[in-house]
Amino acid sequence: MTQQLNVDPAEIKKFEDMASRWWDLEGEFKPLHQINPLRLNYVLENANGLFGKKVLDVGCGGGILAESMAKQGADVVGLDMGKEPLTVARLHALETGTKLEYVQSTAEQHAEENPETYDVVTCMEMLEHVPDPLSVIRSCAKMVKPGGHVFFSTLNRNIKSYLFAIVGAEQLLKLVPKGTHDHNKFIRPSELLKMLDQTALQERGITGLHYNPLTDTYSLGKNVDVNYIVHTTL
């Protein structure tokens, strides 16, 4: 009997259709380009740098974060189930002369073949796009080496996040295409921490990611009402 993959075909198709524009700084993925320096710095600071470390980026898409980590001297593997985003990621890496590897696989499949392999695992803006986020979290815990770091980012589920991420970002400001997110799939920090309790991962810190529409800029802070990042270690 074939094991059912932890993917949502509609989610895969959504990002496949936009894949060619992944590296367009003014396109649908502009917010990802804007927040990437913040995400990268958060990982660098909390993982004590990435140079020479083996890093896995789960749900890498077109490779924005994965490529930036490779440029820090990390040995990076980008993991995604979308064929087109991975094609775009590989082409962009060739164009920029960035050395890293991209693999089409689920986190669960990769974990079976690569237990305790990575010094750092990142899973950014991905948990809210899969049917079973706990399964992904367990896989990340399985793939990181003892003493290693795992980073998760997702969106909180409340009225404010609905107004900011759905009404504001998708409908009014059109920062991302309509239908990019499903508010019902957003994950409260308390829910994410309960999932972590079902693994050996220990939460080390949580920070919010804030958008200022007046300046069109992002920053990190204590408020986790909308976007947030969690740092864990094994």
From Swiss-Prot:
O-methyltransferase that catalyzes the 2 O-methylation steps in the ubiquinone biosynthetic pathway. Belongs to the methyltransferase superfamily. UbiG/COQ3 family. Keywords: Methyltransferase, S-adenosyl-L-methionine, Transferase, Ubiquinone biosynthesis. It comes from the Bacteria. CDD domains: AdoMet_MTases. Its EC number is 2.1.1.222, 2.1.1.64. This is Ubiquinone biosynthesis O-methyltransferase. It holds the Pfam family Methyltransf_23. The gene is ubiG. GO terms for molecular function: 2-polyprenyl-6-hydroxyphenol methylase activity; 3-demethylubiquinol 3-O-methyltransferase activity; polyprenyldihydroxybenzoate methyltransferase activity. It is an enzyme of class 2 (transferase). GO terms for biological process: methylation. It catalyses: a 3-demethylubiquinol + S-adenosyl-L-methionine = a ubiquinol + S-adenosyl-L-homocysteine + H(+); a 3-(all-trans-polyprenyl)benzene-1,2-diol + S-adenosyl-L-methionine = a 2-methoxy-6-(all-trans-polyprenyl)phenol + S-adenosyl-L-homocysteine + H(+). S-adenosyl-L-methionine binds at R39, G59, D80, M124. Transmembrane segments: none annotated. Pathway: Cofactor biosynthesis; ubiquinone biosynthesis. InterPro entries: SAM-dependent_MTases_sf, UbiG_MeTrfase. It comes from Aliivibrio fischeri (strain MJ11).
